[in-house]
Amino acid sequence: MSATQADIAEIEKLEDRREAAMLAADIDTLDELLHDELVYSHSTGGMDTKEVYIGSLRDKITVYKRVARDDQTVRVHGDIGLVFNHVQIEAEYKGNDLKLDNRLLAVWKRDDGVWRLLAIQSGAIPPQIR
């Protein structure tokens, strides 16, 4: 397995860990996986830092109920990993049920041999083209 193939496999496993941590509201795992400079750009237009995103899960402002990913492609360019996928999410946000159907770009950055999630850009798929 080449370095790039090994990196792709590692990033895919990290995405699985991140999804499991989101569903379990596993703050310790998310703290480990997320870069301190994380920018999370939601499909709703909101933007979170690592601190705000983790706080939302810790305080149960956001509760993930289901996350389903498919159509995933991972590209690695040096110490940057790009994950492109389709994600369907069922969550509760501030007591309101949400069903999201989004395209997602996740940017992973390797620092000192450790991959951490640096950025997410989520875009809603318009209902008329689903």
What are these regions (language model features)?
Residues 1-33, 37-130:
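A beta-strand edge to alpha-helix "cap/lid" segment located at domain peripheries
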